[in-house]
Amino acid sequence: MRLQLRSFSTSLRRANNVSQQLKDLPSVSGGGPFPLLPQFQPIGTPPSLVSVSLPASSTLFARRGSIVSINGQLDTITSRLSSLSAFARTVQGMPFLYNRISATAPATLLVSTNTSYQSSLAIVSLDGRTDWTVAQRDALFAWAGAALHVQPNTSLFGSARGGTTRWGNTYLTGRGDVALVGRGQIFKIDLSEDEDILVHPANLLAYTTSQGSANPHGQFVKLNHSAPLLQLPKLPFIERLLANNSLLKSYLDSDFHRAVQNTNKSIRKTWAKWFGTGNQLLQIQGPRTILIQSQRTDLREIVSRNDLAKVGSSD
């Protein structure tokens, strides 16, 4: 037997050069009456790195183990482990350990997603006029800004009135930059005032919120499924038998039949509570901006069991 060898030609794709991003150091301090805010710049297609331009006297919060490279004077940079609402985020299964990086001199850092799944990054810039809600538990990746407030949900078992549950949400207010990590690629949708959209909750990464609106977090709806229409042949004998069957009529009017229906509804509700039904959608009204991820997370990670039961058992 002759052994046949096939030759494979390989080509090296040109790597992204990040030298310039590392060399660009901010020249204005992050303190004083007119501070320079840290700047986030995504790198890659889709972005998997973020270049952070850190002015002097400023602070960066980044997920633990995400730092790839640092350009700056080593003796002017300090890093220590910090927790973000450890109890509330632990109960909800959310990451709570972050590196708090401070610099007394200008520095530039590269941070990576460092995830076991295919992911990409999106940068959200807050100017103090628009707030954001992060809908995924593990989407908060890095943030910077002295006037930026990152507030995890502390209502552990409650839901937003008339809308989605706040289980696992994180609220962003103030001024600063935030890096979010999503599964797959991240896309942006802009809705005008008279527009609305249906989004699967497992694909919803983040969205702008307006506290003055009637329903700032959207509302759950159920996608209706029509039963298949079967054309059966007419059987007069069977039709007369069923029409004149007093036993069948008595069964349909009995308490036992109603008990069977209630049991069936209870089973559907329990199944939806623990496993979901796959047809829950979130109706979001404009005006607002939405970030969606191309790959889904487990629906039970972002929606409470009570909300799953309510939507799954509805007709």
From Swiss-Prot:
For whether the record's keyword set contains Transit peptide, the answer is: yes
Q: Where is the transit peptide?
A: 1-101
Q: What InterPro entries does the annotation carry?
A: AIM24 (IPR002838), AIM24_sf (IPR036983), Trp_RNA-bd_attenuator-like_dom (IPR016031)
Q: Main localization of the protein? A: mitochondrion
Record keywords, A-Z: Mitochondrion, Transit peptide
Looking at the keywords, is Mitochondrion present? yes
GO cellular component terms listed in the entry, alphabetical order: mitochondrial inner membrane
- Which biological processes are named by the entry's GO terms? inner mitochondrial membrane organization
* Annotated compartments: Mitochondrion
What domain of life does the UniProt record list for this protein's source?
Eukaryota
The record ties this protein, via PANTHER family, to: ALTERED INHERITANCE OF MITOCHONDRIA PROTEIN 24, MITOCHONDRIAL (PTHR36959:SF2)
Q: Provide the family line.
A: Belongs to the AIM24 family.
Listed name of the protein: Altered inheritance of mitochondria protein 24, mitochondrial
Organism of origin is Yarrowia lipolytica (strain CLIB 122 / E 150)
Annotated gene: AIM24
